[in-house]
């Protein structure tokens, strides 16, 4: 699997991103764009996000892989309020309304019962704490689906296997700890994401692991999905020259819930090595080049032995 991402940061808090990934075996991949615009005012900030993507993904089954493809549009408008801030900590809360539309296909034939038009609201509480040289981030979120904007009810509701009125709780935690070893500048960063469901979930609301943004080392063509789950990312970084670093990463993830019973397994682990840094040339360029491989996967779970990718971001 080869990944690529490019991002352009404008003035006035706007950011446009374009991403692309292509699979080596099945033609699986993701292509799309993301737009972000934000405006701060006092202790408040308003933000608008929209992303569109087309994807092809193979889901692991007992006897064969299913080519699951589609397109999706996600839009949200949020308002953030700074609740507390001093030299050691920062606490803020964000409330947003969101809308999602999607169409899905199997072997290029649209799955009519999987047409989605859902909307709702979400709230997130975030806490950032400075402890010596380390920075700790904690987040708690709740997402609720409603009948707003002429939402369509999920066909799975008739069988108790999903709903457009989902209730999802998320937990996030992160750590950045810079330190020195001799005269070498090192740092350790770690992030955790967990999801719990209070209602049955359709596929689009389930947690998927195995790819660049969840458990690295996997090509993302085949994933594991579940109503509940978590993944944990870890990096050891060495600043070998100026603003340039080499890093080693280790990730693990696990999913559970009724939908996982027909999958090959529930746990993945992978490793990655990469180079990242900044270059000043008519603005700031940020690059990340990496290669990863699986460490643990279920038997018969198909993925490339090695996966490479890069991202390039520009900021004025």
Model-derived segments and their meaning:
Residues 40, 45-189, 193-195, 199:
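Transmembrane beta-strand segments of outer-membrane beta-barrel domains in Gram-negative
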Residues 36-40, 107, 112, 302-313:
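Short, electropositive alpha-helical surface patch
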Residues 6-23, 61-67, 105-113, 154-162, ...:
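Extracellular loop and loop/strand-boundary signature of outer-membrane beta-barrel proteins
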Residues 1-27, 31-54, 78:
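Predominantly transmembrane beta-strands of Gram-negative outer membrane beta-barrel pores used
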Residues 5-7, 29-33, 52-56, 71-75, ...:
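Transmembrane beta-barrel architecture of outer-membrane proteins
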Residues 3-5, 31-33, 37, 50-52, ...:
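Polar/charged side chains located within well-ordered beta-strands of beta-rich proteins
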